[in-house]
Amino acid sequence: MAFQGTSRTLTQQSSAATSDELQKILFSPDAIKKMATECDLGRHHWMRADNAISVRPLVPEVTHGSIASFFKSGYDAGELRSKGYMSVPQVLCAVTRTVSTDAEGSLRIYLADLGDKELSPIDGQCVSLHNHDLPALVSFQPTYDCPMETIGNRKRCFAVVIERHGYIGYTGTTASVCSNWQARFSSKNNNYTHIAAGKTLVLPFNRLAEQTKPSAVARLLKSQLNNIESSQYVLSKAKINQNARSESEELNVESPSFAIGSSSASRSEAFRPQVVNGL
């Protein structure tokens, strides 16, 4: 039978002072800066030839040490039940290419545990993306909470690993990866349902159709068509008659008569206003 009870959060388990201390560790200006610079949280990471394999921990080393010390002191004092766990419900990566679609290359993205020397994908959650498949959204869901421990000189936590393959002749940036996640820390841990890594291919953005109104290109085409029409028909002393029963204005134009079957008559009858899609 599955457990159906309730569990207390870290804030409920600790005093307000220790809770504020943890908040300061996680959300201080220095901690936020390190999350950006060391982990690339919410930032675009460029995949280059000189950076073919990228390993980005989800927690900076300094922040990891501060959190581990916080939990250890609470554990040694008998205030907390464990030395702390890191929980990440989901990691979402937005991947876009920065080269043409005919470039031969691919990316291999997966979530790893820094406690594993081999850096193997967690539960086989690994996604391969060919260059012509991009853009795409990739998601990972760890099936366990990671202990906040140190193994040798390694700070154990989850990490996003990105491998670049191929792209012969392209030494610069071939793809951009923007990763987002929300790390949680608690004195309790759990196991979670295994979910395969998600891969959603996204249609490239059609910036010419982003507006509901006629675009600048459509307006230009319309103006060109109007210029063509005005160049073919020259109004000579047109008399404007206003009808009181109608809101429109009628133009009475005296145009020269054409012989039936002549080339001029055929051109006149064959001409029809052209319609541009979206106008």
Swiss-Prot record:
GO biological process, alphabetically ordered: transport of virus in host, cell to cell
Stored InterPro entries: MPV
GO cellular component: host cell plasmodesma
Superkingdom, taxonomy of origin: Viruses
UniProt-annotated location(s): Host cell junction, Host plasmodesma
Assigned keywords, A-Z: Host cell junction, Transport, Viral movement protein
Stated family: Belongs to the cucumovirus movement protein family.
Annotated function: Transports viral genome to neighboring plant cells directly through plasmosdesmata, without any budding. The movement protein allows efficient cell to cell propagation, by bypassing the host cell wall barrier. Acts by forming a tubular structure at the host plasmodesmata, enlarging it enough to allow free passage of virion capsids.
Protein name: Movement protein
